[in-house]
């Protein structure tokens, strides 16, 4: 490099220039070694490479990659620290703000999360994801009305259905015992993904609350087919069957669930000799919304 610089400029490369070039080369080596290490699953080595690279140069792209690697290592506080540094140099980067909001949510730092979301709204109040993040925050804080309002704003700002916001709003409405409205939201997202076991479970719970046991049974049966390891589907289906006086059929469902996920259902009751008591315990344990199907 020094030879060519001398050839074309007539000047020899200074010691300072040489050191700067060496520093740049070292930075590139650490950065791309880190990227390669992360790709092949050597996370600790990757983190060390990114740390060393950032000691040599403050590079936003590398810092973002480093933050992502820290999330993979479950070091959320470390990732927050890196993204906050990026935010200092790029305060208008909406993606960084939304990623920060999610990390603050996961670490239950709701005040900081709200500040970040408000900053994002000042940049662009038409961004649905910001309202969705606020909805999650309000739900976590127990402010269901504000959470529903933010879900509604998120939904209204997107031309196509915002599945996550509909699903969250349906959950909120269920907790608020607005079962008809909750079912309407679930129906919207089931049109988008009719085999989503989470949507089907919530649809079943709506149907139970609205005294539609046959529809609820259809939902839970479909969940068992799609994902046989959703233990709650067996419990809720068994509870409905018990309420209908179909003790043998309920016992069969419970046994089926036990064979597929014995450890999860074992927590309901240590002994399985008494199916009726078992279903009482199971439904009580798995019914946080307080539905009553007559058991």
Positions of predicted regions on the chain:
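Short coil turns that delineate tetratricopeptide repeat
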Residues: 57-58, 91, 125, 159-160, ...
